[in-house]
Regions:
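N-terminal segments that cap or nucleate solenoid repeat domains
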Residues: 1-36
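Glycine-rich hexapeptide-repeat left-handed beta-helix
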Residues: 1-11, 45-48, 53, 59-61, ...
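Generic amphipathic, hydrophobic interface segment in small proteins and small subunits
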Residues: 30-54
Length: 176
């Protein structure tokens, strides 16, 4: 459901799909060609939420910001199922794994990966093209490879395609 909150109405870019069970409200701007999955909650009630183009916000993701602050999600980002992004910045092409938490004022660099279930603490910086795992998240002595980038580009395109297919393809059983 997309709703205004007080004086703010979400702005949804062309070709972006918001699932009917997702909630997007308040001071939210979502770019073009994004996928907002079932159960996602994008709350622009306290602060502002900005999501770039071609980003996948998978099922049950929560995105929120502190009062008068901003959460920023870049272009071509993947936010895995049930992760929480709170008052943080996630740069272009980054991946936040399922169930991970990215807390206040943290920053995830371009092409960085936050592993499933990891907790990125307040003010923590995950450098570009690095992998962070664990509770609290620790940056591994590994970098994201070109092969990994190529594979993830493919999967990111899959979500862009879903954003295109869902408006016509999602229907009640028996309805064609």
């Amino acid at each position: 459901m997309i709703n205004a909150f007080e004086d703010h109405t979400p702005v949804i870019g062309p070709g972006t799909y918001v699932h009917p069970s997702a909630d997007v409200f308040g001071n939210v701007q979502i770019g073009a060609g994004c996928w907002i999955g079932p159960g996602a909650r994008i709350r622009g009630d306290y602060g502002r939420i900005v999501i770039g183009d071609h980003t996948a916000v998978e099922d049950n993701v929560v995105i929120h910001a502190r009062p008068d602050e901003q959460t920023t999600i870049g272009d071509w980002v993947t936010l895995g199922h049930a992760c929480i992004i709170h008052n943080a910045t996630v740069r272009d092409w980054a991946v936040v794994g399922m169930g991970a938490i990215v807390s206040d004022w943290a920053e995830i660099g371009p092409w960085a990966v936050v592993g499933e279930g990891a907790v990125v603490r307040q003010n923590q910086q995950i450098p570009p093209e690095r992998i962070a795992v664990g509770v609290p998240a620790k940056v591994l002595d590994k970098t994201v490879t070109d092969a990994y980038k190529s594979e993830w580009k493919h999967w990111k395109e899959v979500y862009v395609d879903l954003a295109r297919r869902y408006p016509a393809g999602l229907r009640a059983p028996g309805n064609r």
